[in-house]
Design a protein with these regions (language model features):
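Conserved P-loop NTPase motor cores
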Residues: 1-20, 29-32, 36-38, 55-61, ...
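C-terminal regions of RecA-like/P-loop NTPase motor modules
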Residues: 5-7, 299-307, 312-419
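P-loop NTPase motor domains
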Residues: 25, 39-51, 57-287, 345-349, ...
Length: 419
């Protein structure tokens, strides 16, 4: 977890960490972000002959995220079909039991969370209306939809789940209240089957190109009003990366999935439990989750279990109120708080921070190389400076960033000015 408020040098620090990571360990790197903060880093990797895949999620992008793509495993791994009532009883047991780190992946539980996100829109008042019987019916519908799609020889899409719920609504053997609830849930799914969201979530998904670096710009989904769609998209990204990790678990190459602006992702209280369900097994697959955020205030209390799984906390210079936000999720001693508050920074020079691990508590000073500092410059004046060089010299944005890096080297006294 890298935590750094606005202006703390988070992007530059991440660029430097990513470069060291790729140079030394060469994992398969996935970066999810909003705002194209790492577009220049991806261009830099491509210039160094690493394979790069850039994905931008926006209308007309042609991307399908297929949130229920793993449902076929429920059919390929036979399980005893149970009734809605039995499923709801199992849910109560699952919610109350402590999870074992060695347990197998709960695909049905994961897909239920996705369905709940879509049906409730991630709204607290809608989530509060859900009963255990509703969740049991969702799971039953997922199993029915998965069977229908599997028998048809295709991947399950959101429309299959809607059809299963409408089928339940038409079954006279079910109580009227359950039929009405099934109808309502089916209609709620319709939001994710129209327009841009239908393009993303109601089509079969394709395998991503093999690449050393995959940059996912969340684009339109990062805007206000798309919170539920963003959460569903993130679950699909996690599943996609998980499938690659499972496929390549016997290879010696690891996977790193880094999420910038993580506070945008985890605002939904259902998402942190979903991430925990999958990521807790990633160490066995050689996959690692990195989170970077400028705002812990938006992390709901349900994120505590996810954040407790974090081994390394890198906390860049921060004000007192942000230190208290860290204390919501991680117990801090008075000495640790004092250390966090003592960190300082000098723009374009260095940023101090604190590393908190089980065996290490230390103040550090991050001095990113000029190139990675230039690649991570995201402020408006920084972009304007690059643009001026691009227009004056007819060069690419990456070349302009390199020139700014040289200017920083000159200012730092480690290079001579061009004559």
């Amino acid at each position: 977890m890298l935590f750094g408020p606005t202006g703390s040098g988070k992007s530059a620090t991440l660029n430097s960490l990513f470069a060291q990571l790729m140079a030394i360990h060469r994992p398969r790197l996935f970066i999810a972000e909003a705002g194209n903060s790492f577009g220049l880093f991806a261009d830099y990797c491509e210039e160094l002959e690493l394979t790069v895949n850039k994905v931008s999620i926006k209308p007309g992008c042609g991307i399908s995220l297929a949130p229920f793509a793993d449902a076929h495993r429920l059919i390929e791994t036979p399980a005893v079909m149970v009734s809605e009532e039995e499923l709801s009883e199992r849910i109560e047991t699952e919610d109350s039991d402590e999870e074992d780190d060695d347990e197998e992946r709960d695909i049905l539980g994961e897909l239920e969370i996705v369905a709940r996100l879509m049906i409730t829109g991630g709204e607290a008042k809608e989530e509060a209306k859900l009963e255990r019987a509703d969740r049991g019916m969702m799971r039953e519908a997922i199993l029915v939809a998965a069977r229908a799609a599997y028998n048809a020889g295709r991947q399950i899409v959101t429309g299959d789940l809607q059809a299963a719920l409408y089928q339940f609504a038409a079954e006279e053997a079910r109580p009227e209240v359950r039929r009405t609830r099934a109808q309502n849930m089916g209609e709620s799914l319709g939001v994710f089957m129209l327009g841009f969201l239908g393009e993303l979530f109601d089509r079969p998904g394709d395998n991503w190109p093999e690449a050393d670096v995959t940059l996912i710009d969340l684009g339109t989904l990062a805007r206000e009003g798309y919170e539920a769609a963003l959460a569903v998209a993130y679950t699909s990204l996690v599943n996609t990366i998980n499938n690659i990790a499972e496929r390549d678990q016997f290879l010696d190459r690891e996977i790193v999935f880094a999420t910038d602006e993580a506070h945008m992702i985890t605002t939904n209280p259902l998402l942190a439990p979903f991430v925990v369900k999958i990521v807790k097994m990633w160490r066995k697959l050689g996959a690692w989750l990195w989170l970077a955020t400028q705002n812990l205030e938006d992390f709901p209390n349900t994120s505590k279990k996810m954040l407790n799984m974090i081994e390394w906390w890198l906390c860049l210079v921060m004000p007192p109120e942000e230190v208290e936000e860290i204390a919501r999720f991680k117990k801090l001693t008075a000495e640790q708080k004092a250390m966090l508050l003592s960190a300082t920074k000098t723009p374009y020079c260095y940023t101090e921070g604190v590393v908190l691990v089980s065996r290490i508590e230390a103040l550090f000073r991050a001095v990113p190389p000029s190139l990675y500092l230039a690649l991570g410059m995201t402020e408006k004046e920084d972009k304007a400076a690059r643009r001026a060089i691009m227009q004056a010299q007819g060069v690419s944005e990456l070349a302009a960033a390199k020139q700014i890096a040289h200017q920083l080297d000159v200012a730092r006294g480690i290079a001579k000015a061009a004559t």
